[in-house]
């Protein structure tokens, strides 16, 4: 019996919608990363993108435990000398709430071209509206 390997052109991808209201950031991100990679499927193949599309709503209502709301700090660099910038979780939620979930999930995906392809299947929205109704996403309860 030969080992099964999924072919990129035969992979069936579903669309799911997830409500992030009250969900813990890390626990939500691990489940999203698992589904974006396709590890929940029987035909999972490490070198093929077998994951599903995921729409995350209400990113501004995601929860963190402990004092992380004020203590967790996100860093980025502008590219200029002395250009390191920082923002707390509260500031990130106020400015761009989608980035909090995107950063958490991106860190859990593989690095390289395959990981970037998986990350592109994640659609995060701060509010309760999305423009993917034509794909008929199923509700995913996490």
Curated annotation (Swiss-Prot):
GO BP terms: negative regulation of translation; translation
Domain of life of the native organism: Bacteria
Keywords, in A-Z order: Ribonucleoprotein, Ribosomal protein
CDD domains to which the protein is assigned, alphabetical: Ribosomal_L13 (cd00392)
GO MF entry, a single one: structural constituent of ribosome
PROSITE patterns: RIBOSOMAL_L13 (PS00783)
This protein's GO CC annotations: cytosolic large ribosomal subunit
Stated family: Belongs to the universal ribosomal protein uL13 family.
Subunit structure: Part of the 50S ribosomal subunit.
HAMAP family with a match to the protein in the record: Ribosomal_uL13
UniProt xrefs under PANTHER family: LARGE RIBOSOMAL SUBUNIT PROTEIN UL13M, RIBOSOMAL PROTEIN L13
Functional note: This protein is one of the early assembly proteins of the 50S ribosomal subunit, although it is not seen to bind rRNA by itself. It is important during the early stages of 50S assembly.
The name this protein goes by in its record: Large ribosomal subunit protein uL13
